Amino acid sequence: MLTVALPKGRIAQETLEIFETLFGDGFAFDDRKLILETPKFRFLLVRNQDVATYVFHQAADIGVVGLDTLEEQGLDVIRLLDLKRGICKVAIGMKKGEKFDLNKPEIKVASKMVNITKRYFEERAVSVDIIKLYGSIELAPLIGLADMIVDVVETGSTMKQNGLEVVEDIMTSSTYLIANKNSYIAKKDEVLDIYEKIKSVIDAEQKIK
């Protein structure tokens, strides 16, 4: 049996739909339950930020999580497959009309993704003061807390509604199937079997597009 960590919300639903396509059974969590047991799989419903942690510590054999979260956390897990879902960007946003100038002294950047932000500016040899926030990131430039933000952007509508605009894309993210390194060895046949099955679904979807 494989234990699968899924993030709560849309990604969990989309992933379970893939399993339904593959196995023909109904896969759905009972109301408020966090564990779904089937003959071949045990699904765990966890916070998005915790998926890779469950997989890294082998509380789950495999999991589904956004590439942005993987890059931010830097945990040593195997990235098996890009699921081509949950596509978004990590981008820099500023107040509309303001100039994106990395030569400006004492740049302040607000973000919940401190490590991605730090790497981006270090690669450009730019010294910045990173302010970690946990939500309502768009507020920071509006009240003078920060010059710019680094945040996940899907359509950009949230930034626009708050008088901000995207000035630079840092990375494109999508959901990934990941595996624990020990599980990949101990349960290699099972892991590779589900990998191949899911890959066939993703490949078929891409041909239709």
From Swiss-Prot:
Pathway: Amino-acid biosynthesis; L-histidine biosynthesis; L-histidine from 5-phospho-alpha-D-ribose 1-diphosphate: step 1/9
GO CC term (a single one): cytoplasm
PROSITE patterns for the chain: ATP_P_PHORIBOSYLTR
Pfam family, one: HisG
Primary location group: cytoplasm
CDD domains on file: PBP2_HisGs
Reactions it catalyzes: 1-(5-phospho-beta-D-ribosyl)-ATP + diphosphate = 5-phospho-alpha-D-ribose 1-diphosphate + ATP
An annotated GO BP: L-histidine biosynthetic process
Single Gene Ontology MF annotation: ATP binding
Keywords assigned: Amino-acid biosynthesis, ATP-binding, Cytoplasm, Glycosyltransferase, Histidine biosynthesis, Nucleotide-binding, Transferase
Top-level EC class: transferase
Top-rank taxon: Bacteria
Listed EC numbers: 2.4.2.17
InterPro entries referenced in this protein's UniProt entry, alphabetically: ATP_PRibTrfase_cat (IPR013820), ATP_PRibTrfase_CS (IPR018198), ATP_PRibTrfase_HisG (IPR001348), ATP_PRibTrfase_HisG_short (IPR024893)
Location(s), subcellular: Cytoplasm
Protein purpose: Catalyzes the condensation of ATP and 5-phosphoribose 1-diphosphate to form N'-(5'-phosphoribosyl)-ATP (PR-ATP). Has a crucial role in the pathway because the rate of histidine biosynthesis seems to be controlled primarily by regulation of HisG enzymatic activity.
HAMAP family for the chain: HisG_Short (MF_01018)
Family of the protein in this entry: Belongs to the ATP phosphoribosyltransferase family. Short subfamily.
Record note on quaternary structure: Heteromultimer composed of HisG and HisZ subunits.
Free-text comment on this protein's domains from its UniProt entry: Lacks the C-terminal regulatory region which is replaced by HisZ.
Protein name per UniProt: ATP phosphoribosyltransferase
Organism field: Sulfurimonas denitrificans (strain ATCC 33889 / DSM 1251) (Thiomicrospira denitrificans (strain ATCC 33889 / DSM 1251))
Gene symbol of the encoding locus: hisG
